[in-house]
């Protein structure tokens, strides 16, 4: 209870700060392969305990200008969701290409109705067993927008859910 409330307050404060930003301070050149590798390492043990394999595929060396902590939060939120909603024994693929990166899970995907609303603040698809506030993807979308990136949420052709962040 207290952990969930604390996480909700943290996410609300993060969104509030992001909403008030018009441009970014402390911008650095960020090698995205390093950023993704660090995020994968951070969640690796949690994923292993959940019985989920995380695979990192680097197909390009891309450097983007951005705020490191915010881009880290963006990737961490995506990985956290992918691990949370994937069944035990499945895999999460993180793939970096020249124009985008994707996070794809082997979960059930989501219904077309839910897909139309996912990423709205506080929206959670019906029938969720996992806890959450419905703010994580809103935070992802806002951070991406501040960095001139686009976020596409979709059911993957191979099954599961896929998030593509492109520039």
List PLM regions with ranges:
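Short beta-strand/loop element within the Bergerat-fold HATPase_c
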Residues: 89-100
């Amino acid at each position: 209870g207290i952990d969930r409330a604390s996480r909700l307050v943290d996410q609300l404060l993060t969104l509030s700060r992001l909403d008030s930003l018009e441009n970014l301070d402390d911008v650095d050149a960020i090698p995205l392969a390093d950023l993704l590798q660090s995020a994968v390492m951070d969640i690796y043990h949690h994923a292993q305990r959940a019985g989920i394999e995380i695979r990192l595929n680097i197909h390009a060396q891309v450097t983007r200008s951005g705020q490191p902590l915010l881009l880290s939060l963006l990737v961490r939120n995506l990985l956290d969701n992918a691990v949370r909603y994937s069944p035990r024994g499945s895999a999460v693929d993180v793939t970096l290409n020249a124009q985008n990166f994707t996070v794809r899970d082997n979960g059930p995907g989501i219904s077309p109705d839910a897909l139309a609303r996912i990423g709205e603040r506080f929206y959670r698809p019906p029938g969720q067993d996992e806890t959450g506030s419905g703010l994580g993807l809103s935070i992802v979308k806002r951070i991406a927008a501040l960095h001139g990136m686009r976020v596409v949420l979709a059911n993957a052709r191979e099954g599961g859910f896929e998030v593509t962040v492109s520039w």
